Amino acid sequence: MSLQSLYKSVYHRIVGDLPAYINELRAEIFKNGKTFFLGSLLQRTAKRYPDNVALICVDKKITYKDLYYRALRLSELLIERGIRPHDRVFLFLENSIEFYIGYYGIVQMGAVVVPLNTFLKEVELTHILNDAKPVLIITSADKVEHFRSMPAVVTLPILTEQDMRLDEPIPVQLPDFKVHELDSDELIALLYTSGTTGLPKGVMLSSRNCMTNAFQIVSCMQLHHTERILGVLPLFHSFTQSTCVWAVLFMGCTVVLVPKIERRYILGALQHKPTFFLGIPALFGLICLMKNAPLDSVKYFFSGGDALPDRIRCAFELVYRRKLCNGYGLTEASPVIAVDFEDEAGPTNTIGRPVLGVSCEIRDDHGKVLPQGEIGALWVKGDNVMLGYYNAPEQTAKVIKDGWLDTGDLAYIDAKGKIVITGRLKDLIINKGFNIYPQEIENVLMSHPAVIRAGVVGKAADMEGEVPVAFVQVSKVDPGLEKTLRDLCMQHLAMYKVPREFIITTHELAVTATGKIDKKVLRKQLK
């Protein structure tokens, strides 16, 4: 069977298995060639599930009816302040009910929401300000002074949660508000990437992109209005937006928000008995260390955002006797591309099959589609693929060709039609003409019980091109550990893949805001 035929059979099998309510939802969202407008989503859900609890955050709760009214009042305030459709509005808030009010207050009056990474420094924020040219910033009161100290913000109006009229009583009968609907393919959300390869790039998403991926998640997870989703990851992250800001609203689910990734907040949120737990590998590692976290109510655990180490997967299954579902995506695809739900054993870097409506190809350097089992660049296509990079047509042209997106990841398709990620193309190390995939080395290093984190990067070598160097984080430095790790690599890897240098430290390795090892920083440390 050809790869294309294999995907078609998987696609039709999934569609055929969808419950009736999912197919009804699909008919509602994708009607007459037009996609449901993101800005109308909260209004729709507030009418359909007015009394459902939309959000729980520590000791606060809000229903969909009340959330919609708060967002409606913010939309009116933005219009009063002169904000117009298509204007860019920055949203710089941590996980909170106010984030949702800000998000939907922006999009339902037709403006473009720009959710910002709250960990960004002034240099990165200034770059984004100059690139996106927002007309207004919504942030918390304690961040106003920080923004005002930046030259690029001196004249920009700033709203805080104090301007959201949160003390205003909710009327019994909600007032009418005419959502300013944009075309399905117009820009509605501008998400800046974490900048692991340079300054952040603005990923342009349309309603079609957002609603397509939200529906793909609903159909994949088969959500009902009774579900409770544990929202631990930052809301500025594309995965959290797709799952906890868009998808849940289709069904009127409840999001249990964790304001910060701290033990007390996680344990507090678990008291609300969530049914879905979404996280990154490092978070599940933390849950393993807790040993007795109350997880009985959770039906599915999803790990994404980074490669899932065998050690964390096995530890989680051993401690809690539950399976971690592995997933894969990137902001440029809104972001979810594939999910591995099945219970069968397989390598951790297996990310499953594409979600509904996504096509995948493995290509060589010349664009030729490779047969099953061969490693190449992973390309994806679907209505969830971004419009492009903001103000960067040349960069867009490099990654999108004929509707296909180059993910930048190396992968192959196994015999069951599942995608197996082998590493990042940009992280590829070439030694004497041999390709070395850092993730392969990292997986070996992570199998040692003393290793907490491992990151491998290439170092220039005159006669060899590049050689691998391993950064290893441990809790305690053992004098014989370097030899042990070298022997471990020699046992499992070809000699040219064995790191020439081991940098072992008890200090935390640099990570991005989404928890991935920041290899840009590791390369700088080498220099």
List PLM regions with ranges:
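Conserved AMP-binding/adenylation subdomain of ANL enzymes
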Residues: 211-228, 235-276, 285, 290-291
